[in-house]
């Protein structure tokens, strides 16, 4: 009856929020209570609310922006603002790791938090690259945000403590100036559209007020389904012993196929530390990644051109047009076939230039 017969409060189901708070205390050691938890109708809504809370036009007539310390970054952020030019972005440092691997790192030498920045935001792991910010990088960003009295937003849709699609060493971090956004989507419940925001009570009260205006209340369906996993203690077990090993196995398969398909070409793959994507860098690609996308689409192979994950900074950077995001979440035979076709089209593209 409670699934469809009652409204929850605008901050979300109280029992669910209490259970999430207890889980975060136990698993992460975070000093949170139910009032530090707000429920939304999915992560996309969480970030829509947060971006427009901390950025855009403010009462002091100043326009504030969201600073993304490391791009490429999640494509879904860039249309979430009610105003234009909502984001300030920074290029990463690129670390070459062996002949065919690389890793993006935050360029702290260039990173500057100016007075018009309303918040910092990172995803961990990152969609599209599978990058996981190191504990050292995250701690440095946390200090930087605190020094400038702006919050640090961490998108944990693929991260810790659940769904834990993380393959590198990483510690979940939260404090009173940090906002962590979680989701039920990657534990197998994408259709229930349930986002979870962990923040200080000033922020959760603001989300509560926004929910009341936009929705009256967030949906009860996801929290009530997940409550069974929380009551039984199975949520973390599901993440650690089912979800993470499943995607790790699929990752190893896909990396093997991609290395075979691209052998002899100047390719690099971002070290896959989390999520379920491979980020392919084709250095010196004679055609743009958008053209390569169209060629692959014509052969029923869907990727996303990397250019869409770098907001236009107004400066030319060839790297933006040399990357593809590849998902390995489909059936293995489909992934293998798609990677084979990617290899054929990449070889063909380099052959046009005599490479």
Model-flagged regions — what are they?
Residues 68-71, 121-124, 153-156, 182, ...:
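Short beta-strand segments
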Residues 286-292, 333-337:
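Short, conserved charged micro-motifs
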Residues 14-18, 22, 26, 31, ...:
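PLP-dependent enzyme catalytic core of the Aspartate aminotransferase-like
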Residues 2-148, 153-175, 179, 350-355:
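Conserved core of the PLP fold type I
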Residues 62-66, 82, 174-248, 260, ...:
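Conserved core segment of the aminotransferase class I/II
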């Amino acid at each position: 009856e409670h699934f469809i017969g009652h409204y929850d409060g605008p901050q979300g189901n109280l029992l669910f929020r209490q259970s999430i708070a207890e889980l975060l205390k136990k698993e992460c050691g975070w000093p949170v209570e139910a009032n530090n938890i707000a429920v939304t109708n999915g992560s996309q809504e969480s970030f829509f609310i947060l971006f427009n809370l901390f950025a855009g036009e403010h009462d002091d007539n100043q326009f504030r922006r969201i600073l993304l310390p490391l791009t490429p970054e999640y494509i879904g952020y860039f249309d979430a603002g009610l105003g234009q030019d909502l984001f300030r972005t920074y290029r990463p440092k690129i670390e070459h790791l062996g002949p065919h691997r690389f890793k993006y790192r935050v360029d702290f030498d260039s990173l500057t938090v100016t007075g018009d920045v309303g918040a910092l935001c990172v995803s961990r792991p990152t969609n599209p690259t599978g990058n996981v910010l190191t504990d050292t990088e995250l701690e440095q960003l946390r200090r930087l945000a605190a020094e400038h009295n702006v919050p640090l937003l961490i998108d944990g849709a693929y991260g810790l403590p659940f769904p834990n699609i993380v393959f590198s060493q990483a510690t979940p971090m939260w404090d009173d100036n940090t906002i962590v956004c979680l989701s039920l989507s990657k534990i197998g419940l994408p259709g229930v559209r349930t986002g979870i925001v962990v923040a200080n009570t000033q922020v959760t009260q603001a989300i509560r007020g926004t929910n009341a205006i936009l929705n009256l209340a967030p949906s009860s369906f996801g929290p009530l389904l997940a409550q069974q996993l929380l009551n039984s203690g199975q949520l973390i077990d599901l993440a650690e012993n089912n979800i993470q090993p499943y995607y790790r196995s699929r990752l190893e398969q896909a990396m093997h196929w991609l290395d075979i398909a691209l052998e002899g070409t100047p390719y690099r793959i971002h070290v896959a530390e989390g999520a379920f994507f491979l980020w392919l860098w084709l250095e010196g690609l004679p055609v743009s990644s958008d053209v390569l996308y169209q060629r692959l689409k014509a052969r029923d192979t869907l990727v996303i051109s990397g250019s869409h994950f770098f907001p236009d900074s107004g400066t030319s950077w060839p790297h933006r047009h040399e990357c593809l995001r590849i998902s390995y979440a489909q059936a293995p035979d489909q992934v293998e076939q798609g990677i084979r076709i990617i290899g054929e089209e990449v070889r063909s593209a380099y052959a046009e230039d005599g490479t």
